[in-house]
Swiss-Prot record:
Keywords: Amidation, Disulfide bond, Ion channel impairing toxin, Neurotoxin, Secreted, Signal, Toxin, Voltage-gated sodium channel impairing toxin
Protein name, as recorded: Beta-toxin Ct1a
Domain LCN-type CS-alpha/beta: start-end pairs: 20-85
A GO term, aspect molecular function: sodium channel inhibitor activity
Comment field (misc): Is neutralized by the single-chain antibody fragment 10FG2.
Predominant cellular place of this UniProt entry's protein: secreted
The organism of origin for this protein: Centruroides tecomanus (Scorpion)
Subcellular location(s) per record: Secreted
Pfam families assigned to the protein according to its UniProt record, in alphabetical order: Toxin_3
Tissue specificity as recorded in UniProt: Expressed by the venom gland.
Superkingdom to which the source organism belongs: Eukaryota
Signal peptide: 1-19
Length: 87
């Protein structure tokens, strides 16, 4: 019984510690922010922090800016019912 309680508590804690992640999106076009220097990228870090706050992180992944440590309601790519100019 104690082990079941511990497992449940650990799963609840993991759920609250993990933050949302996703591609930075341009709300007017529905497109991801593009980047070309993969990995650590000052441009992506700056754009993610500007849109999502100082606590956000960002780097270039698959030629798009990937933002980390976002709040749960953060809007990331893809936008519902909005395509990236047919791409």
């Amino acid at each position: 019984m104690n082990s079941l309680l511990m497992i449940t508590a650990c799963l609840a804690l993991i759920g609250t510690v993990w933050a949302k992640e996703g591609y930075l999106v341009n709300h007017s076009t529905g497109c991801k922010y593009e980047c070309f220097k993969l990995g650590d990228n000052d441009y992506c870090l700056r754009e993610c922090r500007q849109q999502y706050g100082k606590g956000a992180g960002g780097y270039c992944y698959a030629f798009g800016c990937w933002c980390t440590h976002l709040y749960e309601q953060a809007v990331v790519w893809p936008l519902p019912k909005k395509t990236c100019n047919g791409k």
